[in-house]
Amino acid sequence: MSHPVFVRPELVVDNVTVTYNNGHTAIYDASFSLTGGTICALVGVNGSGKSTLFKSIMGLVKPSVGKVELSHKPISHALKQNTIAYVPQTEDVDWNFPVLVEDVVMMGRYGKMNFLRIPSREDKAIVNKSIERVGLTALRSRQIGELSGGQKKRVFLARALAQQGTLLLLDEPFTGVDVKTENAIIELLQSLRDEGHLILVSTHNLGSVPEFCDHVILINQTVLAAGPIETTFTQKNLEMTFGGVLRHINLSGTALHDDNDPRTVTVITDDERPAVFYGHTKNDPPAQSQSKEQNS
């Protein structure tokens, strides 16, 4: 069975402000736009509004001001069409609930079924292909609570694949997984991007952002910067976004070079995978994106 052909979606978040009933404004005047065929990182400190932004895109909270549209239609239309798929944090899931891997993946088809939720032959074929694509065919009849952290992540990726959404939202997909699983997830996301999906990834893993993302949104109650990795994921913008939270390590001069090369290495980390910058100014792109360009 071939992969479905998607019409590339366009996500527009226009001047969105979300104020909760207790009066707390979680995000304000947030604006950006993205098109299909893109992997975009959503980066910010805890409490910066990332979760609220995700909820507004998923229609779980209604903006007090502004609007969210997918492919020039209100987000409510996209929800009715089941075109937004969500991969949650593992901490948000009750792993003691007795359910099989294949049943979790089948949940991605619920929006396509009638109220009796009896899967069709097509539903079963799509679920089989989704499980195969994330490499869990041998574990399809296992209880999900028995799986490792990385395997659980892949189950929910398979559910998102089965849903056949054009917009995928992933909340901290690399937390608690090993390097091999992280690389497998990245490879899958890149293949989905190449098929035309729009993928928005909330992550604290700064070091991996320039390696697999095309765009980045930096948020701290509002969108501080948004654009291509090479021009937006800079030391200057990260310092603006994270304030004093990040730790800096700088190497320059004879500690780094045998000659008079004026460039410096700056390592920025929030105690997860660090971002490395090598250049003259705080506006230079990350070292990872420079090496990616040289290898392409």
Swiss-Prot record:
Keywords assigned: ATP-binding, Cell inner membrane, Cell membrane, Ion transport, Iron, Iron transport, Membrane, Nucleotide-binding, Transport
Ligand binding (ATP): G44, V45, N46, G47, S48, G49, K50, S51
GO molecular function: ATP binding; ATP hydrolysis activity; ATPase-coupled transmembrane transporter activity
Tagged with keyword Calcium: no
One GO BP: cellular response to iron ion
Region Disordered, residue ranges: 276-296
Cystines in this chain: none
Ranges where the ABC transporter domain occurs: 11-246
InterPro entries reported for this sequence: AAA+_ATPase (IPR003593), ABC_transporter-like_ATP-bd (IPR003439), ABC_transporter-like_CS (IPR017871), Metal_Ion_Import_ABC (IPR050153), P-loop_NTPase (IPR027417)
Topology relative to the membrane: Peripheral membrane protein
Family designation: Belongs to the ABC transporter superfamily.
General function of this protein: Part of an ATP-driven transport system YfeABCD for chelated iron.
Protein name per Swiss-Prot or TrEMBL: Chelated iron transport system membrane protein YfeB
Lineage of the organism: Bacteria, Pseudomonadati, Pseudomonadota, Gammaproteobacteria, Enterobacterales
